[in-house]
Amino acid sequence: MTAVTRAPRWVVAGMAIAAVGGLGGCADTWFGGGEDEAPLPGQRLSVLLLERSLEPDPLLASEPVVLPRPLANEDWPVAGGNPGHALHHLAVGDLLDVAWRRDMGEGETDDNLILSTPVVAGGKVFLLDSETNAIALDLASGAVAWERALIPEFEDEDASLGGGVAYGEGLVFVSTAFGDLIALDAASGGTVWQKNLSAPLRAAPTVANGRVFVITYDNRLFAVDAAGGEILWIHEAIIESAGLLGAAVPAVSGDLVVASFSSGEVVALRVENGRQAWADSLIFQGRMGARTNLSDVDASPVIDRGLVIAISQSGRLVAVDLRSGLRLWDQEIPSTQMPWVAGDYIYIVTVDAEVVCLRRGDGRIRWVTSLPRFEDPEEREGLILWSGPVLAGDRLVVTASDGVAMAISPYTGEILGLQDVPDGVRLPPIVANGTMYLLTTNAELIALK
């Protein structure tokens, strides 16, 4: 019998600030260097609106930011890079140029969005496009290895909002907006098993310890046997009717899985049986406004060396001891993006278009860099949505919905380079085997080496 656990019904209650007028000195290659290489086609964009609301701690002004050395990661098998979502500092080249570009299925429309990044494993890139087609691209040949249309018969293709992919044990696990969790053979694309979970799946699954973990739109976390598709247990969180489009991906470390829900709950559960180890709330009630009235959590939690980092769009960032559930510190910072942990620092892109560097140990702010918020800053129209960051090759990379990729110094917050992309980019980059990949809203995959 499948075990079902339910949430308790309690109420989920050298310092530098980068100041840039216009980035006229941006280099011709991606993020600096080499004047002879041709950039992607398109017009350079200037930073026209810079605002700052968060403030660095002045007592940290003289503290140097020291990061771990870049390490090569062969694959990026799940959303967030690995099951715990902590990758620290990834290795890529000093100069990044476009190695290749490929159309990868159907791009976004007004009705259908791509809400999850691709994954890389076993020499292939896997992704789910805006019409629920699962696609595998062979990295050696550049050819499409296989493609599967996964919209159920008699379903409306305009309902393809969300879902994603993960890789593990030779299988590609696909979550869809139609409530299906599907295991495909990574080599052929053939169906190994399929399970309908009776509610839309907005986010990608994650895979660890022979289990697939995925969250439904109605706030149920399923643990499913990766080999055969048997439902092992279900955790039911508080149902929340109002929320954002996406959803958080669970993080796994050892015998615990940590999940954030649209109710504002963040819970740690036993991988084996789904029993709750602890719970916390990410709802911030200190200010009034439309943003804080939403309890939703789209940012995936991070587990790093026994510490859980979780954040909500309403403005609550917490650091929690993984084993005890004790909250060690918190900050009033709003974000829909997964925090990036590197060594003793945490980097966050806020909903207010700021990149923030905090100390991991106590949450104090080291530096803040403001980004453009509007395409038309004078009229305050055309809201720009920023994604990321990813730390690779001594630079933080963030992307923007208006078609910009930007490199920022992780040490000072200085903007190092700016490059526009032919289409918008609403998802953060991913990195595997020394290559950075960007997926545009038009479902074009750009590889940078």
Model regions: which residues?
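Extracytoplasmic beta-rich repeat domains
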Residues: 100-119, 147-166, 193-208, 231-253, ...
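Short loop/turn segments that connect beta-strands within beta-propeller blades
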Residues: 138-142, 185-188, 225-229, 271-274, ...
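Bacterial signal peptide processing site
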Residues: 27-30
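Blade/loop signatures of beta-propeller domains
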Residues: 38-58, 63-99, 276
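Structural signature of WD-repeat beta-propellers
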Residues: 129-130, 160, 169, 176, ...
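C-terminal motif of bacterial Sec signal peptides marking the signal peptidase cleavage site
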Residues: 22-25
